[in-house]
Amino acid sequence: MSDLENKKQEQSPKKRPYNLREKKEKKAAYRSLIRPELADELYDKILNIVVVQKKYKDPDFSAKDLAKELQTNTRYLSAVVNSRFGMNYSCLLNEYRVKDAMHLLTDKRYADKNVEEISALVGFANRQSFYAAFYKNVGETPNGYRRKFME
């Protein structure tokens, strides 16, 4: 290699295979401001609204809607969801949607419904997001899961 090539190589950042970069630890500014008592109270209210009232079935129910209902802002809500549930808002909704879908896919009363209809019943806006969330949570496709239980 020439001296010019060596200098260029020294100046350029080290390239990792497949453009992988070191994952940086994210620290949300709001997390340090969360009072544990308020976070616990919000946790209970979030569970009530999302799970008990089954708002997860509404494909248009956003974090903004939930924050408005809880009379807080979306950043604080997001920080509470992340700290108390260990996931972001959309993953939280998708987890409950997938659990509901698992039940409906194996329920004989819904045997006449196709996967797309079931995905709409549990609150997914489209089939692709349903398949992606289902596979992420269960480890197999909705059709594969259903076949396993219908045999």
Task: Name the predicted role of every residue range.
Residues R75, R127-Q128:
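Key DNA-contact positions within bacterial/archaeal DNA-binding proteins
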Residues S129, T141:
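Ser/Thr-centric signal marking residues that sit
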Residues S2-K108, D112, E116-E117, A133-K136, ...:
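Membrane-proximal linker segments that couple transmembrane helices to downstream signaling/catalytic modules
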Residues T72, F124-A125:
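The short coil/loop that forms the "turn" connecting the two helices of the helix-turn-helix
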Residues R109, K148-E151:
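Long cytosolic C-terminal regulatory regions of eukaryotic multi-pass membrane proteins
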